[in-house]
Amino acid sequence: MPPLRGFSDNPFSDKGDVIVATTALVQALEPYFSPGQARVRLPIYSGAHFDEVAADLEGFARPIWAIAAVFAESATTTDPTLQTYAERLVSGLANGVDPGHPEYWGAIDDWDQRMVEAEAISFALLLAPKTFYEPLSAHSRSHLVEWLSGLNGKVMPKNNWRWFRIFANLALHRVCGVPYEDVKHFIWEDFALLDTFQLDNGWAADGPWRKDATDGEEAYGRQADYYSGSFAIQFSQLLYTIFAADLDPGRVSRYIHQAREFAGQFWRYFDKDGAPIPFGRSLTYRFAMGAFYAAFALAGAYDSSSPYTSPGFVKGMLLRHLRWWATHSDNVFALDGTLTIGYLYPNMFMCEDYNSPQSPYWAMKSFVMLALASNDELWQADELPHPLAAIEETKSLESGVKLLSAPFQILCDHPDGQHHFMISGGQFCVWPLKATQAKYSKFAYSSAFGFSVPTGLLLTQIAPDSTLAISGDDGETWVTR
């Protein structure tokens, strides 16, 4: 698998470097736009559990996280590739929400994947309305309101998805002119559920947190993973502080406080070189693991009273992570330069049933800080080193070990062994996803070694790393924990 020029050789040291990476990533997608620009379909098939139109919408919407950020300051850019790409998106948006167009995305139904992509579209409308809303005709604007309003009243999972509807309603009000009173009750209904996910120290679970084995909690798991931080909840909370400061000042203040608390612990999910600890589901989103720091910077949530919330620290955490992916991307991209389903190499065993070929482009959430001007304090600050770099100088094992009580984990760094790992004994996922036991319930996870997922029932197929495996019939069958 070839590296991708512009990403794999990228030093990721400043804003210009991130723009170069964005250009490289979206340029590979250009041949796969539909004639009406509303769909992007890569020339492979994964059998995701939703329809192909929704999968094509993923390909259209997910790069918007970066493209909208590029156009936050101005409706034009000097990069011709990104300018053309944005124009494609505007045309595609108009056609995708038009029920009379052949490339209509379809109305949003219960449990619909379209809900997920509505957040990225709403983000673009909120952040860069001059680029993504003002060019639309009155006819297209009406269709857009109808399509986004389709989330309201629909059944959604009890997890991070509720944020997608909140952002759709924010865009309806802030950009499309829908009165706040018409959407406020939908927003507050979703907040009533999301508030129940909150744990200690800024953490939030990705769904109701099972406290014990009492009746009535059988449908609940214990999941506090990258969805809690970078993929969804903390990420969306921070973006909410940007777009709802006057509408909901109390909640905005609370979310900023929680983000600062979370920042004091989340850095331990990464080693001193920026390598993340692979844990939980949806790892095919790859460098979206660092998106918490991109959103933190965009929200300007800095606090000089903590060493973990300064511009230099946030910049270091984010850019080190992107550099790590750049230097480990030789097998991440397909021959045409598009992202593959997998982690450090294409891997369908560890993917989810909701991963279409276009799904990996959620990785571009880590580029939302491109909305910040070149003279912003993030770009002007010097990168600060990872705290563990200083710890290793002292050769102090104890200072590299920390109990994170909220997610039931102990984060460890062994300076002599140069090993960064997590001991995790209390999380589990009850949703019927692929290999959830391997993704949540092993005893340990490491930034140096990917964990194995079972491919069959034989011991060699189970590959029980960080797992207790017991056989009562001379190896015919195995029970694992």
Q: Residue spans of the language-model regions?
A:
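Low-complexity, Ser/Thr/Pro/Gly-enriched N-terminal "stalk/linker" regions
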Residues: 1-58, 87-92
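Generic alpha-helical structural element
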Residues: 14, 18, 52, 110, ...
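Intrinsically disordered or highly flexible coil/loop and linker segments, enriched in small
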Residues: 38, 76, 157, 272-276, ...
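Acidic, serine/threonine- and proline-rich low-complexity regulatory regions
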Residues: 45-49, 106-107, 273-279, 345-352
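Aromatic-lined, polymer-binding surfaces characteristic
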Residues: 53-57, 64-74, 82-263, 267-295
